[in-house]
Amino acid sequence: MKIDTSLTMPQLPEALSQAGLQFAVATEEDFDEIMAMSQDIYGGLDYLPTRYTSWLQETNRTVILARKQGKVIALESVCVIDNGETMLVEGLRVAPQERGKGVAGVLLRFCCELVKSKYPEVKVTRLTRDDQLGPKDFQKYRLITKQGILLVRFRAEDLKLRLSELNLGGDIQSSLSTSSSNTPPVRLDHTAIHRLYLTTDLMQGVLPNATIIQDWQPFKPLPSNMAILLKKDIDWMVDDVANPTMASLCTFPYRVPVGDDWYYLNIDMFGKDLDLAQQQFLCHLQRHTTTLKGHVMCQMFLDPPLWKPMAEFCNKTLSVELVKEYTEQCVVESDVV
């Protein structure tokens, strides 16, 4: 299905207008072509194969393709959140041979114009990045918050054995003698999530800049956003329901194209207490590795000062492999003009 580009296009860079880009809404039939141009993207941790079909069905989301001479060369997804005031840009990818030519910028401008025509109340564009932000980026974007990215890998069977060696079979907190809490982390049901995040201000001091980040998606704690989040397979955890100082969201594991039998586990941590973070990390690992077989890439996002001690904990205590050194996840936004 073609989109009427007459309502959208700002002036194209001359080279691109001559190259002749066409834009269309993505369909199921485009999947194989999209995957073919997405090889090796995101270090093999591409979530799109798992999410593509559901993305096409989300009423508040538009997935746009750019074609050149009939071939898909770029994709971008835009999801309208925050009561219709924010467009969240996700999934950007450009075919290797077309990178560095300005395609991504043109596609983003196209998507912005399209969303503005459909949702005139949209005020802000928001996206999450893991590359180094430079002066030009800060001319375009405001930094909302940033988290340290800790990426480790392990075989599920090996980690299960290691957890049993650490005597974590039943009582995780008793195995962490330095823990600042004697009570185990609490997994929240939907009622408790609503109460904590929407009807009290208890999470204000825990969430980074009042932002719930779930697997690269930043949301404000609003009922409309919570309706989106609660449809997903996520474990929500806090250290204390009455007075939380540490919270985490663990997205259920899904397959990624690193190789056969590779899974991705995403854990978003909020708060500044290392011991409580370790407790919740272990609880998530224990819960989700029990049924997994094969290799797991586990990516944790946490307050930057916690990165180094948590990396040491992963290496020395859990004997899992650190995949890369410190990098940052940055949530940025700009006004829609």
From Swiss-Prot:
The keyword rRNA processing does not apply. It comes from the Eukaryota. Signal peptide: none annotated. Its EC number is 2.3.1.33. Residues 1-2 form a propeptide. Keywords: Acyltransferase, Transferase. It catalyses: L-histidine + acetyl-CoA = N(alpha)-acetyl-L-histidine + CoA + H(+). This is Histidine N-acetyltransferase. It comes from Scomber australasicus (Blue mackerel).
